[in-house]
Regions:
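Short, polar/proline-rich extracytoplasmic segments that appear immediately after membrane translocation
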Residues: 2-82, 200-217
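A surface/secretory-pathway sequence property marking extracellular, secreted
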Residues: 47-68, 113-163
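Extracellular adhesion/glycan-binding regions together with long Ser/Thr-
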Residues: 2-12, 68-84, 140-178
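Short amphipathic alpha-helical surface micro-motifs
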Residues: 18, 29-31, 36-39, 87, ...
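C-terminal, structured domain-capping segment
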Residues: 81-114, 162-217
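Short acidic, gly/pro-rich beta-turn/loop elements at beta-sheet edges
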Residues: 8, 20, 45, 58, ...
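Surface-exposed interaction patch
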Residues: 27-29, 36-40, 82-148
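Generic N-terminal initiation segments characterized by hydrophobic and/or small/turn-forming residues
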Residues: 12-19, 31, 123, 127, ...
């Protein structure tokens, strides 16, 4: 017999939804180069340059300005109260500062989590109840217009996260820029199955990966 749904106030869940690892992977012909950006190497920023390959990744602040991402950048709101119906949109900007064209994709993966117990006494993990979506644009204005309101964001973010979510591939010529809207939400229909009880607070740590491959054709 399934437990009956009931209204239970949601406890505050401070999720570690931060950019804990930004990986830029450049495949240049015969070799591959990897650059990890984590809080253990604060001197490394998000600018990766090798043999004409130069990519920068930024995120948009609340005042509309853009900030380059490094290993200590909190891209997601780590004080967000995730409950059914909550939606968050993060805007990224990928720039080709080099001299060679490349194609890239963006992925979100779960780097770590803490399992908790819900109000029904059942174990659960947050990634089981979060959904993601990605929208892209060639200009900042186009990006803003692509998600004019919350309802549009909800319609876009319909892919389950589970442990990994990946976008399609996008091409970027030298001097080009691509804007990305990354949407995370907890559907309203989730209910109390993701509402924890007890002393163990559910937690999830996400990483964002940007993989870029040189276009040789």
């Amino acid at each position: 017999m399934k437990p009956q749904a009931k209204k239970t106030p949601y406890k505050r869940i401070a999720l570690a939804l931060s950019l804990c690892a930004l990986l830029i992977w450049a495949i240049l012909g015969t070799g591959a180069s990897l650059a990890w950006f984590t809080d253990t190497s604060p001197e490394i920023n998000n600018i990766f340059h090798f043999a004409g390959f130069d990519v920068e990744v930024s995120h948009r602040l609340t005042d509309g300005k853009w900030e380059l991402i490094d290993g200590k950048t909190d891209v997601f709101d780590d004080e967000a109260l995730y409950e059914p119906g909550y939606v968050q949109v993060v805007y990224l900007k990928v720039e080709n500062k080099g001299t060679v064209p490349f194609k890239f994709d963006t992925a979100v993966n779960v780097n770590g989590c803490i399992k908790a117990t819900n109000v029904f006494g059942q174990p659960f993990m947050l990634q089981e109840y979060l959904k993601f979506g990605i929208a892209t644009a060639d200009t900042e204005e186009e990006m803003k217009n692509s998600i004019p309101n919350r309802n549009t964001a909800v319609e876009i973010a319909n892919e389950p996260l589970r442990n990994y979510y990946k976008s399609g591939s996008f091409e970027l010529a030298p001097g080009g820029t691509k804007y990305i809207a990354l949407i995370v939400r907890m559907p309203e229909e989730v209910g109390n199955v993701a509402n924890y009880r007890g002393d163990t607070v559910p937690k999830i740590e996400l990483g964002i990966t940007v993989k870029a491959d040189q276009i040789t054709d």
